[in-house]
Amino acid sequence: NGNNELDRALAEGIHLCNIERNGDVVEMTSYAPLLCKNGYSNWNPDMIYFDNSEKIRLTESYKMQKMFGQHAGDTYVVSELNLPAALKRYVGTSVVKDSKTGKTWLKVVNALPRTLKLQVNGLGSKAVEVKARSSQVFEL
């Protein structure tokens, strides 16, 4: 229904997979608004909520953005996701390589209500599972 915090984060994750795929034309993304004091929201969703104590609540969107930030690369690796067309809009994938560390990351965002079992070919064949309505990063 799109009103759920997790639904929004999964949609953002699928969008970020597409952003990475088009990294040759997209130089930067941003998230706004970032901070919100509890009870004073002018816009929904915000990413980080706080109050007058030291209590901070990090949203699912924060966790999704963090996943992409911590597993960034400077080279996009062309990949193909073999799913029925009706399901592709609910799954995002992105493969990037970081030339400084030599690490290659596969990010999978699964907005489907079931676990995905994927066979990854190319940099060594391996099977991976991504739980329903979640995201995961794999080092290839």
Language model: regions and residue ranges:
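Aromatic/acidic polysaccharide-binding cleft in carbohydrate-active enzymes
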Residues: 1-93
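Active-site proximal loops enriched in glycine and acidic residues that flank catalytic Cys/His/Asp
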Residues: 30-33, 52, 80-81, 108-112, ...
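Short, glycine-/Ser/Thr-/acidic-enriched flexible segments
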Residues: 33-36, 55, 100-101, 110-114, ...
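Short acidic, gly/pro-rich beta-turn/loop elements at beta-sheet edges
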Residues: 39, 75, 116-118, 128, ...
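Hydrophobic beta-strand residues in large extracellular and virion-surface proteins
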Residues: 48, 53, 106, 118-120, ...
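Carbohydrate-binding surface patches
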Residues: 88-122
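Intrinsically disordered, low-complexity Pro/Gly/Ser/Thr-rich segments with frequent PxxP/GP/PP motifs
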Residues: 123-140
